């Protein structure tokens, strides 16, 4: 079945793969998926033109829903069917995100947020794995090398319920920006400080999502960020959903 959807996030996974998600015309959240190896980053483009990006309205041929709680949004699609329609005007884009806002992370997933290791919920339950919130406070942007010599991209914030989270940012645009700034000679602390100032000076929306379970903790799924940063006058939309921790 062909139908349009507005993309809310494009996120980095592994080995050149990405995760995408958004909403259809009825306000249903959808995560288009493909069998392994999944969606390659090259499919975000038609020639040299980006056609799948946050705020893009696209048409896809959807085939089989494959919900597995909490990832109830999953639905297979035909990658050859993607048709770019338009970029959403700012106010329409803002209105759509505002309509999906939840008061906090726990309210998005409708199940307790457990801790140690990190923040997580139990796999196999819950009505959704993606949602939007407006943070009460952006506390810290973290960009540094891990003990495994891999770049980390994290955000620490307080949600509307007063809970504080420090979560991984998997947003493709966010990661490209940080990587580009390093390539131009900026230091990671300077990059993090600049992003923090920009977020703290703006209205911010966060798109928050759950990772897939992984071998070390097979019964746990971890929240994080993927999506985009869109800076408008006095408004920043940071979609942070995680397809993986």
For each predicted feature, which ranges?
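Short, Lys/Arg- and Gly-enriched loop/turn segments at beta-strand edges
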Residues: 65-77
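Nucleic-acid-binding small beta-barrel platforms of the OB/S1 family
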Residues: 1-4, 67, 92-245
